[in-house]
A protein has these predicted regions:
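HotDog/MaoC-like acyl-thioester-processing domains
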Residues: 1-8, 85-126
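Catalytic strand-loop segment that frames the active site of acyl-thioester-processing enzymes
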Residues: 1-50
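A generic structural signal for short beta-strands and their flanking turns/coil linkers
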Residues: 7-11, 19, 29-31, 73-77, ...
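Short, intrinsically disordered, mixed-charge
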Residues: 25-29, 64-68, 116
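Hydrophobic beta-strand-centered segment that forms part of the acyl-chain substrate-binding groove
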Residues: 42-97
Length: 129
């Protein structure tokens, strides 16, 4: 797939309790922040939060299926979680190509993930794919 600077893509996902449970079964991430409401209530989050891997997983789908597209993998990324994600949130990943290597099939993306309120929950300062 040919990509150009300025090209954009978007992908959304509404997260459910089943997503959280399935992710835990697959990865073993049974952190009480995701399953124990009494435990979570005593933390800065005050309620159950979704595993970060579900948020970053949306990025992998975006890169592999949308921009640049099939066959693409992350070579490197640097992200920062800026807010928690909760069950019921709809998260949206937006990617934009900011540079394309002149001689290799490599590009740099700017990616942000927001929730339905418009609040940013994850920022990627740089991602090479």
């Amino acid at each position: 797939m040919t990509v150009a600077v300025g090209q954009k893509a978007r992908r959304s996902l509404t997260l459910s309790a089943e997503h959280v449970a399935t992710y835990a079964r697959l990865t073993g991430d049974y952190n009480p922040l995701h399953f124990d409401a009494a435990f979570a209530a005593k933390t800065k989050f005050k309620t159950l939060v979704v595993q970060g891997g579900l948020t970053t997983g949306l990025l992998h789908a975006l890169v592999a299926l949308d921009l640049p597209g099939p066959g693409t993998v992350f070579l490197s990324q640097h992200w920062k979680f800026t807010a928690p994600v909760y069950v019921g949130d709809t998260i949206t990943a937006d990617a934009e190509v900011v540079s394309v290597h002149a001689t290799k099939p490599v590009c740099r993306l700017r990616i942000t993930v927001t929730r339905q309120t418009g609040e940013t929950v994850l920022k990627i300062g740089r991602a090479h794919v």
